[in-house]
Amino acid sequence: MVKTITVSDDVYNELLRIKGKKSFSELLRELLREKKGNSVALKHIYGILNGEEYRETRKRLKELEKEFEKWKQFLTQV
């Protein structure tokens, strides 16, 4: 079954840029899997860290995400 969705031009252009040779369905499926994986990982560590450790871990993860995004942009420009 096929469904039609509407996205803004900037979102479409970003998806088009990162999809490469994949179909939009493949790209969206991959992005959803990544998002679900992050959620599962966070649920797994819930309760293991105290408040300060949790905040520090989240801060470091955000820093890493920014660096990975820069790396991804570099790789897609080459």
Curated annotation (Swiss-Prot):
What's the protein called, per UniProt?
Putative antitoxin VapB4
Q: What does this protein do?
A: Possibly the antitoxin component of a type II toxin-antitoxin (TA) system. Its cognate toxin is VapC4 (Potential).
State one Pfam family annotation.
VAPB_antitox
Q: Which InterPro entries match?
A: Put_antitoxin
Task: Report whether Transcription shows up as a keyword of the record.
Answer: no
Q: Which UniProt keywords apply?
A: Toxin-antitoxin system
Q: What family is reported?
A: Belongs to the UPF0330 family.
